[in-house]
């Protein structure tokens, strides 16, 4: 995160950013330069429910340097967001704040298919029949005194299709807990969770695209604009062809591998991820019961159908301002329900560490709260009101300490 000289500071009039239904919220706006409030600055603003079209919008000059906006209220649980922009030195600067209206009462719109569990059980059984065919390649340049580092890959989903990752194993002989780290969206290589392995756990950080994770950065850049461009939107009209079916199975297979290792202690295996990875962490724990805990930061793929009910849905926002024909959209809604994290979260049976930010417009809080609220297993949540689609280092550290505690370290 970079510090900015010019900031648009937007804050609601409740310190905790929380409101009761029907309670009115005011947003206070100040533009600062080097932390000094600026007068006679032109700003433009919008007030909208989470990811919806604006309810209020205007352009105004801050003659005395301060603006107080009466933003109204909400009558149903959710979020009301104020976004304010100004220009400085030819660059647009934005500030935002998001008021929470009884978010603990948000319920998912996603409908659980009658054959949800049957569908995924069948997929797992088909995958089991494919030989794992493990391949490991030592990466001497990444090894340390305490951890051996390998490029790892196994067969997954179909013959000659593979899932790749970086496996790190403590050098000292013994039995160790395991951590599977699943990725956020995008196409990239991975370094592996070496530090965690040095502290005494087996770690496996995987990619999802069926390509090696040790290639040159230019290869991933080319693929992200080529064959893997907009992969997250592929084939949502056929439940067996959705891009994420192979991905979900790859995560299950990664857990299977970790459980097969002679170094594994046999009882402690956590999954960690953020955004797309936050979704995969929850999904993996439901599809593979050997997972013993989950760290999920702002999970994607959450309550995807929200937009069809007039509220925010999760990344990748399949139904936001959709131009699909009615029948196509109906089919995609049906298919998406098999992949929706809200439908998996209802079945979680292991402890969960959850994180979200109110200002997140990638994985909006309406969608992530709809997931958190249906989790019935032991859970704890960290809310960073001002955070957009990121977490501060302190929160990643907090999550890691939670992992260590669950691993008995």
Residue ranges and their predicted role:
Residues 230-274:
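Gly/Ser-rich "nucleophile elbow"/oxyanion-hole loop immediately N-terminal to the catalytic nucleophile
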Residues 13-17, 127-173:
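N-terminal cap/lid segment of alpha/beta-hydrolase-fold proteins
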Residues 278-328, 383, 391-394:
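Hydrolase active-site cap/lid region
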Residues 188-249, 306-315:
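Cap/lid segment of the alpha/beta-hydrolase catalytic domain
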Residues 1-8:
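Proline/serine/threonine-rich low-complexity linkers at boundaries of modular beta-sandwich domains
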Residues 362, 369-409:
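C-terminal catalytic histidine-bearing segment of alpha/beta-hydrolase fold enzymes
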Residues 348, 354-356:
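Short beta-strand/loop motif that positions the catalytic acidic residue
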Residues 90-110:
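Short beta-strand elements
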């Amino acid at each position: 995160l970079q510090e900015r000289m010019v900031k648009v500071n937007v804050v609601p009039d409740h310190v905790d950013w929380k409101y009761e239904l029907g309670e009115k919220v005011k947003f206070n706006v100040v533009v600062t330069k080097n932390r000094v409030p600026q007068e006679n600055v032109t700003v433009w603003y919008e007030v909208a429910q989470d990811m919806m079209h604006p309810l209020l919008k205007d352009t105004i000059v801050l003659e005395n340097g301060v603006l107080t906006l009466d933003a109204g209220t909400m009558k149903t649980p959710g979020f009301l967001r104020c976004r304010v922009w100004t220009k400085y030195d030819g660059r647009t600067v934005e500030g935002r704040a998001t008021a929470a209206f009884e978010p603990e009462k948000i319920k998912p719109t996603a409908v659980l298919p009658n054959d949800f569990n049957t569908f995924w059980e069948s997929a797992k059984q088909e995958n089991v029949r494919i030989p794992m065919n493990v391949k490991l390649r030592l990466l001497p340049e990444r090894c340390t005194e305490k951890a051996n580092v390998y490029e790892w890959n196994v067969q997954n989903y179909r013959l000659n299709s593979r899932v790749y990752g970086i496996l790190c194993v403590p050098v000292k002989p013994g039995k160790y807990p395991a951590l599977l780290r699943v990725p956020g969206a995008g196409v990239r290589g991975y370094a592996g969770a070496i530090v965690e392995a040095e502290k005494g756990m087996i770690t496996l950080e995987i990619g999802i695209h069926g390509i090696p994770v040790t290639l040159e950065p230019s290869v991933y850049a080319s693929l992200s604009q080529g064959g893997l461009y907009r992969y997250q939107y592929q084939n949502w009209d056929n439940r067996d062809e959705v891009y994420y079916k192979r991905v979900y199975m790859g995560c299950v297979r990664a857990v299977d591998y970790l459980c097969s290792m002679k170094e594994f202690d046999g009882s402690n295996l956590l999954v960690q991820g953020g955004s797309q990875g936050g979704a995969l962490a929850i999904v993996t724990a439901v599809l593979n019961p050997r997972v013993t805990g989950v760290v999920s930061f702002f999970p994607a793929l959450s309550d995807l159908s929200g937009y069809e009910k007039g509220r925010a849905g999760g990344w990748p926002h399949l139904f936001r301002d959709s131009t699909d024909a009615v029948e196509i959209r109906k089919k995609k809604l049906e298919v998406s329900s098999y992949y929706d994290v809200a439908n998996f979260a209802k079945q979680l049976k292991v402890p969960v560490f959850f994180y979200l930010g109110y200002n997140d417009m990638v994985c909006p809080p309406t969608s992530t709260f709809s997931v958190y609220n249906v989790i019935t297993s032991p859970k704890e949540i960290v809310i960073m009101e001002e955070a957009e689609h990121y977490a501060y280092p302190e929160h990643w550290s907090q999550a890691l300490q939670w992992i260590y505690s669950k691993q008995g370290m």
